Amino acid sequence: MNQSVNGSGMKRMALINDLSCFGKCSLSVAMPILSAYGVETVPLPTAILSTHTADGFGDYVMRDMTNEMKAFAAHWRQLQIKFDGICTGFFGSVEQMHFAKDFLRDFAGEDTLVVVDPVLGDNGALYGCFTDEYVQAMRALCESAQLITPNRTEAALLAGCGMDAPVETLLKALTVKNVIITGVRRGEEIGYCARLSGHYVEIFKPCLPQTLHGTGDVFVSALCGELMNGKDMPRALTDAAEFCDKCIRKTEKRGESHWYGLAFEDVLKEERDL
């Protein structure tokens, strides 16, 4: 039974990421946003967490899903499922990244959009749970992508450059065809610097004094939604950045704790006139 498309011809995207059950990030953000873009989402959780990992929630519970990932993929392989898009995020181990490379080999067709959001670190440092071997495995996974979306710290780690390397240097050092570096600071602004099919693109917005948890997940989800609806990468970047900025402003207006997540639901509701 070939399940390359669903009955309506709707685009289908596999999401390989963690599921934080409480708090807004990763799969709990990607699934509703992509659904609002008219994209069927197929989650493949790398881990399930009681909450996201920000300090506001204290000690969280986490369950590794490596064995389940392999079993789910084996069943999907029997069904001959193919995907129009595949987006990866957090991995709990090098083993999971090796699995992801095999998953791309088995489930991506010639026209499948492959996006890797290489979760590695932030604020100039590798996350404490990761190792140099993990960085090397992420580098190898990125080679299979048409587009990667690292923040500035992750871009430096992938490129093997110092944390103070200019963004232009990072973009030249990264060999993936399309790269969007997120969270780039410029004075009182923050934004995106990209190399898309050889062309440099940048977008900046006013910077808030606090960090908002899950902003990158909201951006990547909207970016995938734009791309899956046929927009070219520069236009998709522009529109996804605008969507993310609207979510930030809505979160400001609500006065929600910045560590909880963005009020993206308000923007989806407003844009669909509900």
PLM regions with names:
Residues 209-233, 237:
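Short, small-residue alpha-helix embedded
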Residues 234-274:
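Charged C-terminal helix
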Residues 2-116, 120-123, 128, 265, ...:
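Conserved N-terminal subdomain of the carbohydrate kinase-like
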Residues 128-201, 210, 234:
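Conserved phosphate/ATP/ADP-binding segment of small-molecule kinases
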Residues 120-123, 155-156, 208:
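A short, flexible beta-alpha/helix-coil linker loop
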Residues 21, 200-214:
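Short pre-catalytic strand/loop immediately N-terminal to key active-site residues, enriched for Gly-Thr
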